[in-house]
């Protein structure tokens, strides 16, 4: 099924049909919708290889995630990967998972960049001072950070207000009368972990309370379980526990 047939049926040019199907922003939403509906009705599938040659794209996005801790054991992370993959697939774009070891001399994501094997990168579990983002920014390669970092220039990022979450939770417990409040936090320097820890600590300082029940533990159920046992065995155990991830909560 050719573009000419779609163009003839809709009474528009082949160029307009092509630009609509390839996502150009100079095509109106109404025209794009008509073209996509007609293409779907006819079972039209674009020649992906030809489109890649013409557009100079790979039609692939890489998702960079750390080897340690193992985020693939986290159901929330897996759900996020599934949603990203689903949305990209709607635009005929593949998602490549790239495990990155920050202790390695060479990084897989840079091989992808240098070999032009992806069009862009999504970098998950960012660090507060992240050399990966700095390297990508210096190279001019397009990326989206899932988390915030300290970079010299503005960059695209998506994140939750991690600081506000633990700060509000801690304040709520204080208002309920708790004075010995624990936090089970992950034991690494990823940006969201530091933000959650700081929210907890600042809320305690506001109330003049001790942070003696702060614990940094592996992001596993066992880590949460063992840390909770240790806290409950203290002469003055906490009366409330905040966890910064679902696996800690399961263990607690």
Name these PLM-found stretches:
Residues 1-59:
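N-terminal helix-turn-helix DNA-binding module of bacterial transcription factors
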Residues 3, 14, 32, 50, ...:
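A general structural signal for well-ordered alpha-helical segments in protein cores
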Residues 5, 19, 119, 161-162, ...:
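Acidic active-site catalytic centers that drive phospho-/nucleotidyl reactions
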Residues 9, 41, 83-91, 137-145, ...:
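Bacterial carbohydrate/catabolite-sensing allosteric modules
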Residues 16, 55-70, 172, 180-187:
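Short beta-strand segments enriched in small/hydrophobic residues
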Residues 22, 126, 246:
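Short glycine-/small-residue-rich Rossmann-like dinucleotide-binding loops
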Residues 26, 30, 48, 52, ...:
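Residues at secondary-structure transition points
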Residues 60-171, 175, 231-233:
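Alpha-helical recognition/docking segments in bacterial nutrient-uptake
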